[in-house]
Amino acid sequence: MQELIARAKELLADGTVARVLGWKAGDLPYNPEAAYFETAESLDEFVYNGFCGQNLSKMMIEASKLEGKTLVCLKPCDTYSFNQLIKEHRVDREKAYIIGVGCKGKLDVEKLRKMGIKGIQSISGAELTDDCEILNVSTIYGDKTLAYKDAMLERCHVCKGKEHMIYDEIIGESKDTKDADRFAEVEKIEKMSPEERFAFFQKELSKCIRCNACRNACPACSCRKCVFDSTKFDSAQKANVDSFEEKMFHIIRAFHVAGRCTDCGECSRVCPQGIPLHLFNRKFIKDIDTFYGEYQAGADAESKGPLTSFTFDDVEPGVVAERG
């Protein structure tokens, strides 16, 4: 991390960038938050560790409107989102200085809680320079030790790879964390009967409190004005009118980002209710791969997505209906 801070200070000092977009410590050891740093002194508060899971690419939409370049720290999976935003003309590549930061998997504090680890005071073993094999957690109830991989976010177990798709320079080593099939959970749901699927999603989506965290964190949700904020559609309220409305919110949002979602997993990571929202998007990704050939949104900043282009080899719409 010190190398990252030192380089950021250099780029600020020589005028290459006007600000740095990274993370600073939050009020809890597992809760770093996104922050801008405009002076060398402020960078002393910069942090980067296993809990810095937030995808900063969406914040570059507003940063692109500011004077001067913004240095932004992007993990390998974040760079897919940035590429997709370039493709959609939502960010200005010339206004960004991208430092690709190493990643050895990001941590999910909810997994720690499910293990019964509470009252956390400090955590070691999650720094960029660590091997990220063992986590040592100090709590008010005593010390706990666990395997790093047991506390990783779901998305890290199905990682797309540790190669940065776009960058100006790379700092820090990455580590392969993939140990599961990306579509295993989707296939499990596909095998359910229609009644079982309905019951599964009814149970999960009934937890929704309509906080809009998923939409606000999602890089693919980049509309200047969201349809769900329009008073014309009676959907500006935060509390649900009925359970059906909440189901439609998530289903419609999934349709809106289909073909553009990079599967960054931010929707599920930020959900305070623990709803696996990424499963909707991953189902679309799986179907797109099946019908149009394997495609990864954000793998580059030029190619057209399968849902925004046409070829004579495209699957006929009836095939989807026949499959059921």
Residue map of PLM features:
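Helix N-cap / loop-to-helix initiation motif
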Residues: D78, C214, P276-L277
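Ferredoxin-type iron-sulfur electron-transfer modules in oxidoreductases and energy-metabolism complexes
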Residues: K178-S206, A220-G324
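Short alpha-helical basic/polar micro-motif
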Residues: Y80, N216, R269
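Generic structural signal for well-ordered, non-membrane alpha-helical segments
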Residues: M1-I5, C211, C264, L277
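Active-site-adjacent beta-strand anchor residues
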Residues: V72-K75, C208, V270
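Short secondary-structure junctions and interdomain/linker hinges
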Residues: G15-A18, H89, C211, R215, ...
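Iron-sulfur-associated redox domains of electron-transfer enzymes in respiratory
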Residues: M1-F201
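Cysteine-cluster motifs in flexible loop/terminal segments that predominantly coordinate metals
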Residues: K149-I166, C208-C214, C221-C226, C264-C267
